[in-house]
Amino acid sequence: MGFDFNYMLELLPILLKYLGTTMEMATWGLVFSLILSVILANIRVFKLPVLDQLSQLYISFFRGTPLLVQLFLLYYGLPQIFPFMVGIDAFSAAVIGLTLHFAAYMAESIRAAIIGIDRSQMEASLSVGMTTTQAMRRVILPQATRVALPSLMNYFIDMIKSTSLAFTLGVAEIMAKAQMEASSSFRFFEAFLAVALIYWGVVVILTRVQIWAEAKLNKAYVR
């Protein structure tokens, strides 16, 4: 049974219908992981007692274990210990898993970006009457965002690709649909190649967006 190019072309629009689920999952994961990572990064930067040690433990665990294992622990394991989690749906579990996993990586990128900002800028902000919170929000974080943007965009791209693991929880996204189509037609190569092409296309578009965003942010610093 040779390669069926026409079958792959017919499959592409079918799979694209599930791209919305994939992107929604990744977008919610990005939003929540950014919020959590900024909190973790600030805890690490200011070395808050107890919280700093807990954040280090959190980051170490989620960076040191596979995402698939984390998803299984979250969806299949925790409900056995915490009964209130029994009703959690697969989509929500996948979003939570992606959030917890990638926040650990993003937190370190944001922390490094904040530390990379000249200390004198914080001192100058405080000297004109700003509080530490105001200085972080108005002066430090905007500059840190420019520094951290490339790595954060790369993590978002990784997150989109990692949504393919959500089918193991039963989420009906691109990979799940491709698996179903491949199983019914026995055209596994064509089905998974179609998936690869869709992910590749999304990544190419996001890479262009990243280049544009970096140029936009760097424009203010070009003399």
Curated annotation (Swiss-Prot):
GO cellular component: ATP-binding cassette (ABC) transporter complex
Compartments in which it is found: Cell inner membrane
Membrane topology: Multi-pass membrane protein
Coiled-coil annotated residue ranges, if any: none
Positions of transmembrane segments: 23-43, 59-78, 90-110, 156-176, 186-206
UniProt GO MF annotations: L-cystine transmembrane transporter activity
Chief location: membrane
Residues of the ABC transmembrane type-1 domain: 19-210
Glycoprotein as UniProt keyword: no
UniProt keyword annotations, A-Z: Amino-acid transport, Cell inner membrane, Cell membrane, Membrane, Transmembrane, Transmembrane helix, Transport
Family the entry assigns: Belongs to the binding-protein-dependent transport system permease family. HisMQ subfamily.
Protein's name in the database: Probable amino-acid ABC transporter permease protein PatM
Lineage of producing organism: Bacteria, Pseudomonadati, Pseudomonadota, Gammaproteobacteria, Vibrionales
